[in-house]
């Protein structure tokens, strides 16, 4: 019997999705999260943020964790890649979620603008605060992590910027 293919899901996007990274890091059943102020509202999120121009995905997640939590982050695996459309703003985000360990906390380092504080919360703690999660991606990443989803870091490749510049110049 032939396999039945499901119809393709069409994602309507007003523009190119924002490329973001997030860190899922667990210690003793608790996850490192930030409490941040977004549009005058306090919400919970993984340490996460946009990839800056010229930055690799791995460099971006290491930087974001340091800036938002004052912890050093050592990525160990890719948990998943998630495309999400915010129904309120219409903006789309493609999130690359990595798992890894943290070390070298710098208690003297000020946290990134907008970050109120950091917490170590269990999955249940986050479920109980579901209305205060920045997006559904927060729990989805944790659930995938707890379900054992891991991909090698080599799954995510970066094209050398000099090579990319040469190739794009030839392609034009």
Language-model region placement:
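Conserved N-terminal beta-strand and adjoining loop/helix that marks the start
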Residues: 7-32, 99
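Short, solvent-exposed loop/turn elements at beta->coil junctions and helix N-caps
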Residues: 11, 79-87
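A residue-level structural signature of the nucleotidyltransferase/glycosyltransferase Rossmann-like core
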Residues: 16, 23, 43, 118-119
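Conserved Nudix-box catalytic region and its N-terminal flanking loop in Nudix hydrolases
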Residues: 27-67
